Structure formats: C-alpha cells, structure tokens
Amino acid sequence: MISAKLIELIEIHANSLTKDVAQDLSTNPRTPGFRAVRGEELEERVFQLLHHLGNWIGSPKSEKVEAEFSEWGRRRFGQGIPLSEIVYAIIILKQHLRRYIHDNGLVEFAFPRTEGDYVLPMHLYSLQDLNTRVGEFFDEALYYLTRGYEAESTLSAASKPH
C-alpha cells in the first residue's frame, strides 16, 4: 500500500520539483522543442501534474488523467514539438520524481523506522509499491499523451487541402 504521507510529501515539494523539471526540459539536448514553450506554461503544467499526483497515481486510468495528458499531447503538436521529444519529456518527469524521492529521503521520512522485525520489509514493500505505481501512472500518461498528439495530427492533416 502506498503511504498517503509519501504522496503528500511529493505534492508539498511540487514547487522545487517543478523548477528542476522545467529547467531540464528547456535545456536538455533531447528536448529542444520545449525551448519554444513559455516557461510559465511549462512550469504550470509540470506543477499541476505533481500536485495532483496523489489523486492520479491511485487510478492512472481515470478520465482526468486521460483528459490532462490528451490535452498536453494536442497542445504540444500544435506547438510543433516532435513526438519523440514529448515522450522524452515524460521520461524526464519520471526520472526527476524518482530521483527526488531518493535524494531527499522522502521514503525514510514517510516510513520512519520504529521497532520490530517487520519495519524493514514494510518499508521496502512500500517503496516498491510506490515505484510500481509511479511507473504505471507514467505509462498511462504516455499513452494518453500520444493519443492526444495523434488525434491533433489527424485533425490537422484532414483540414489541409489535398
């Protein structure tokens, strides 16, 4: 079971995570298209994702996740960002989140060691469960983002004169 406290900590730290992710997206050699996205827009999208992570991670196949990431895909298509860069943006988000959890001791803080033989196994199980759910969430997000991108691409192609 994922600790609600751990998700809460991620959401609380969304501001600093947002800055790190937005900086990486706008400077990473694999995502040059994101340099054309206004910094405020990029930061707002990343912040909303991290801030709502707790709601979304429990049900990654929800309509809200589909709506958010489909819109993100459509918008990025409209901005002319290649799909490969958008896919890599999701990878960057996931990497930053996992690194932040690890580097800032959020797991230890959320699962304090008390006493008894069962603390460590529960600690490891919770970490593994969180890691699995983060992966599942980003897999679904990537799917919906790609669907939104493709839908916008199809609309764009259909509206062009032949």
Go through the PLM ranges and name each one:
Residues 2-84:
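N-terminal low-complexity or simple alpha-helical regulatory segments
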Residues 65-162:
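Long, amphipathic alpha-helical coupling/dimerization segments that relay conformational signals between
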